Each structure stands twice: as structure tokens, then as C-alpha cells.
Amino acid sequence: MNTAIQAALDHAVQTLQQEGVLPSDWNNSSNLTRTKDRSHGDFASNIAMIGSKAAGMKPRDLAEKILAALPEVADISKAEIAGPGFINFFLNADQRFAILDQIQAQKESFGRSQSNVAKKIQVEFVSANPTSSLHVGHGRGAAYGMTVANLLEATGAKVDREYYVNDAGRQMDILATSTYLRYLELLGQNLVFPKNAYQGDYVKEIAQGIIDKDGDAYVREVANVYKDVPEDVQYAEELDSEGNKVVLSGDKEKHIDGLIANSQQLLGEGYRVFHQAALHAILDDIKDDLADFGVTFNQWFSEASLSAKIDEALETLDQRGFLYEKDGNIWFKSTEFGDEKDRVVKRRNGQTTYFASDIAYHLNKLQRGYTDLVDIWGSDHHGYISRVKAAIDAMGYDSKKLTVLLVQFVSLWRGGEMVQMSSRSGQFVTLRDLRKEVGNDAARFYYVMRKSEQHIDFDLDLAVSQSKDNAVYYIQYAHARICRMLEKAASTGLQFEVSAARSHAARLSLDAETEILAKLAAYPDVVLRAANAYEPHQVGNYLKELAALFHGWYNEHKVLSDDAELTQARLLLSINVQQVLRNGLELLGVSAPEAM
């Protein structure tokens, strides 16, 4: 219906342009939206307020001219001017009921569209280092990324979900060396475990797996492993005035780097055993965790596979005049594209930087023919956006193809108090822990119920409560309530048939029923807006509102009654609410239970 109204408004604009009321080059950027207040009609347009300046008249005066030029629109009973110049459109009664036919015809496809069918979009998300289990912060990125991809697919786009595996960086070397040191410990070697190594018990488990397979084949003298390694950091017993550790001596970074270098030299090809064992153990754990969470990927892209692409990317930048040498390092002229300073892409020792790998990865993405790239990063990567976009432009591509969405941190609350997010050894509360406590549905729902750049205070008590304050429970309960109602109707021998019930739809005359019909009709617009804005919370809020309307109506008015026609009409309304709730929950990755 909104398409027909918009077409009529466009026709009116063309007429007014021909009459000289509006400039011929005026671009109509107005919005046509569903009204929240039923007294304001079904749709409202701000076209007169947007065009008043160009027309040189007051918005209400322009609105009158637009109405006069507006062609007749089928199923619109009236259009009127309201407030400072809004034009409100009222549907006739039959058109309001048409949404019931549309939902029943489209079923699980209702709300989906082909609006973005021309787009091929890659959504890269989570991409956590495979060095430990996913924590609750990663969980938010997983839920958000998966739901954004779902929404884009629902609007017709071809979507690829990708996880970038950081399997070639320093953190993996720290994990591999941590595993090797635990391996030596388990085989009876005495050593002081580095403060900057990975401390978790999972490292010992990986090391034990290597022992079970290869025994003591990789044992080397501990003295040689620690030979000429700089001293590890030593801290004072007391913290400073701000609660931070006070360094007495040593350097934890240089210490672990020395251990990495010695381990690589002593083990030779054997070092890869520890590197790969650690990588695959953690990556398999991450894959299992995400799959259990309903988050899947088309591709797990290995950073280690980018070696040739890094050379290609740097050569491209060099040929285009955007690299230079200084102090033995190779620098990218990112300041020419608005970055705050130039960035090193290759160090004097010949090693390329993580940024160089990121440039190569985005070159690879662009060469795969995507119309749009969506990167979902943690909020601490905010400063990284400008340099990546600069590199894309410098290589001759359009950085506008890249959208970077930042995901803020998550705080857990229980009993009105913030939960300690990490232990003394730095182990964070894991996604698996959260899922075990509140379930997948609550986690998937509450993770996306705020804009991604907003902090989330995750109330663990609320997430498991069975009350209307728990939004996901309230929505699921509405769906289950309708299922139970249909079962009850069937058990009494009531014959319900959609086409027959449709003939009694006019009995849905209560304000509450009209409001539910309008809310159902708004669903496709909500999905499209949520997809284009990358805002899943719009769907979540819509479902909350629809569930609240249904519960309020159900509590006040009997659905199964002695009035056969009214019963049929209300059952028809209910099954349409049920369908839309199910469709929306599916987009959010939340189940629609039939009983609760």
C-alpha cells in the first residue's frame, strides 16, 4: 500500500513541478511512514515540510497544493493535513483486512523482500584470535553479526558470512610457546612460566594431547629454552594509587619474544606441531561454541593464506606512490587520506605488520566482487577504521563499499551487582558460560536489543525470569499462547478454516483489533529499515510491541466464545500474529516454542 501512496505523491510532485510550484530539479527526499497514533491515519508523509523551502511557502500551504494534485489512490478513504504540514492517509476498512490475506499467502516469507536483490554482501564478524574460548564480548559480536546477515538476506541480498582466522600473528606464537612450556612441565621439567603466556588450563590439555601422541619427542633442555632471554617482568607487592601493578624490573614482552625465538630455533619443524595443535584445538572449540549458538559461516578465512596477497597489496600501493622508506621501515601515506599519521607496513627486519595483512585481506575481499563489505569489530578498534579505508582508496577502490560497525562491551549483572568479568589470571566469563546460564534464546535476543555502539548491561536474573519484564519470554509466550489456543479450539471440535474465517474479518471492529492489524502490516517495513540500518533491535522492539498488543487484547477479550463468526475472525487474527512472531524470532535466531 505504501508503494501506491508514494507513487501518488511522486505524481503530485511532477504536476507541481510542471506548474512551477516546485523547482524542476527538486529531489523528493521525504519519508512515508506508518503512524503510531491511529487517530493520525495509517500513513503519514512529511513531503510538504521537506519541500516548503524549495516552494517558498509554508508547509501547510504546500500540503494543500499537493493534496489538490494527488491522484486517486485505491483503498485510501481520505487524506488530510495535520500539525505543521504532515499529510495523513487513511485506509478503508477492507484494505486493513487485506494484510490477513497477504500473511496467509506468504506465510514464512512474509516480511521478506527483494529490495536488496542487486547486492552481494560479505559480512565479516567475530574473527576472535584462536587463542582461547570466546568470551561474552565475542558473543555479542556473534549474535549481532549473524542477525545483521539474516536481515540482509531477508531483503534479497546475497550474503556471505566470514570469520577471519588470525592464525599467523604473534598471539598464535605466544600460544604455541605457552603450549610448549606446559609440555615441558608435564614431562617433569622445572621452569618459571612466563607472566605474558596463556595461563588457562586448556593450554595444559593441548600439551597433554601432544604427549599422548608423540611422547617426549620434543623435549629440549630448559636452560637452552631460556638462554639469553631478557628477564620477565617483576612487580611490587603493592599496587599504585590507581590500583595498577608497579613494575620493579624486567619486560614481559621481550621475555616472551625471546622464548618464542628460542623455541622456534630449538624445535625447528617441531615447533609447527605445537602451533597447529593449539590452533586447531582452539578453533574447533570456537566453531563448536558458535554452531551451538546458531551462528554459522560460509568461510573461515586463514590469515596465513595471505602471504602472496600481502606482496600484491604492497606492490600496488608502491606503484601508486603511497609507500616510502624511513628509518629502515616501509610506511604507508595514510595521512593523505585523512588518517592522523602514516602507518608502518613493513619493519626494518623484513616482517610485515598486522596492518599489512589487513590491507591484503580487504584487497582479497574487493577482488571477490562484493558490492558491499560489512566489517563488525570491537569498539576498541575505532581508530583502525580510517587507515583501512585509506588503504582501500589508495589501491584504487572505493572505500564507501566498506561499512565498519563497532560493537560495544557487555557487562553482566546478577542480583543488582556487576559480575566480575575475569579472574586474577585474566580468564574472561565465556560465551559458553553465559549460554549455559540463560540459554541461547535469551542470549541471542538481549545481545541485539541495543544499537551495536551502545554498551549493554546484561541482567542475568531478568533473562531467566518468567514475566512480562523479560521481553524474550513475553514474546515467546505470546506465540505459545496462540498455539495452546488453537489446540483448545481443536479439542472442542471447533472447525477453523482460513478462507471461511476471512469472510467474517469485518467482525474485528475493536480498536485493539484495528491496532493489531496495523501493527502486522508494518512488519515488512520494519524488516527493511532494520536491514538497511544494520539495527536488529528494531525487529526486537517491534516483536515486543506486537506481543504486548496481543496479550492486552487476549486478556480483555474472549477469543473462543459462543459467537461462532467472531470466534473465527479472532482465531484468524491470532494465527496471523503467530506467523509474524515466528518470522521475526527466526530472523533474530530465537526459537518460537509451541508450549511454555
From Swiss-Prot:
The protein depicted here goes by the name Arginine--tRNA ligase
Q: CDD domains under this entry?
A: ArgRS_core (cd00671)
Origin: domain of life: Bacteria
Subunit and partners: Monomer.
What protein family is recorded? Belongs to the class-I aminoacyl-tRNA synthetase family.
Q: Which GO terms describe its biological process?
A: arginyl-tRNA aminoacylation
Q: Does the keyword S-adenosyl-L-methionine apply?
A: no
Q: Where are the transmembrane segments?
A: none
**Alphabetical keyword list:** Aminoacyl-tRNA synthetase, ATP-binding, Cytoplasm, Ligase, Nucleotide-binding, Protein biosynthesis
List cellular component terms (GO). Answer: cytoplasm
Compartments where located? Cytoplasm
Alphabetized Pfam families for the sequence: Arg_tRNA_synt_N, DALR_1, tRNA-synt_1d
Record organism: Acinetobacter baumannii (strain SDF)
The motif 'HIGH' region: which residues?
128-138
Q: What is its main location?
A: cytoplasm
What InterPro entries does this protein's entry cite? Arg-tRNA-ligase, Arg-tRNA-synth_N, Arg-tRNA-synth_N_sf, ArgRS_core, DALR_anticod-bd, Rossmann-like_a/b/a_fold, tRNAsynth_Ia_anticodon-bd
GO molecular function of the protein, one example?
arginine-tRNA ligase activity
Q: Which reaction does it catalyse?
A: tRNA(Arg) + L-arginine + ATP = L-arginyl-tRNA(Arg) + AMP + diphosphate
EC nos:
6.1.1.19
Q: Where is the signal peptide?
A: none
